[in-house]
Amino acid sequence: MAQAIIGAIAASAAGSALGAGIQAGAEAALQSQRYQQDLALQRNTFEHDKDMLSYQVQASNALLAKNLNTRYSMLIAGGLSSADASRAVAGAPVTRLIDWNGTRVAAPRSSATTLRSGGFMAVPMPVQPKSKTPQSSGFSNPAYDMSTVSSRTSSWVQSQNSLRSVSPFHRQALQTVWVTPPGSTSSSSVSSTPYGVFNTDRMPLFANLRR
């Protein structure tokens, strides 16, 4: 009887140990499988992100190259040389010319040039011709009539006589004694002319007048 009880206890313990071992082995196998799955998922995610980033970089480079080629073609069509077109596309300064109308971008191969520096040209308006009355020549013309000539002469003489009373200068314009030149180290200036007569604030000769 005792042997049977001991045998049952031993069998139960052995079964429990065997079940625990089997469970531990199964859990270890599941953990290893889960680890391999996570590692494969991480590897696939990294490869996917790398491929997508590569495609995005390629698409961005292709779009940039297309835009630069379009700008280059437009500059070439506008008359710029290939060197100036390349500089303009890269953002570098291009060749410029200076004439009486200002600074311009050199475009030697341009098909049309104007005298204006990028300004809008006024639309020419049609001029209505004025009808002129034909005048006869000689003394029969009213412009050469003796009375007209006499009145013109008298009016001119009167205008000249009236101008004689007008002074050619301001009454105090010639009363300046002396003015310190710009290169002088002296700061003294003497003048009997009020500052309101001349606008000397922006004249180089009077630069030291108010020092």
Swiss-Prot record:
The name on file for this protein is Minor capsid protein VP2
Domain remark text: The N-terminus domain points away from the virion surface.
Additional facts recorded? Translated by a ribosomal termination-reinitiation process from the bicistronic mRNA coding for VP1 and VP2.
Superkingdom of origin: Viruses
Q: A Gene Ontology CC term for this entry?
A: host cell cytoplasm
**Keyword annotations from UniProtKB, A to Z:** Capsid decoration protein, Capsid protein, Host cytoplasm, Virion
* Keyword check for RNA-binding: no
Keyword Glycoprotein attributed: no
Q: How does it assemble?
A: Homooligomer. The portal-like structure consists in 12 copies of VP2. Interacts with capsid protein VP1.
**Annotated organism of origin:** Southampton virus (strain GI/Human/United Kingdom/Southampton/1991)
Subcellular location field: Virion; Host cytoplasm
The UniProt entry lists the main location of this chain as: virion
**InterPro entries xref list:** VP2 (IPR004278)
> What is the similarity comment for this entry?
Belongs to the norovirus VP2 family.
Q: What does this protein do?
A: Minor structural protein that forms a portal-like structure at a unique three-fold axis of symmetry, following binding to the host receptor. The channel formed by VP2 may allow the delivery of the viral genome through the host endosomal membrane.
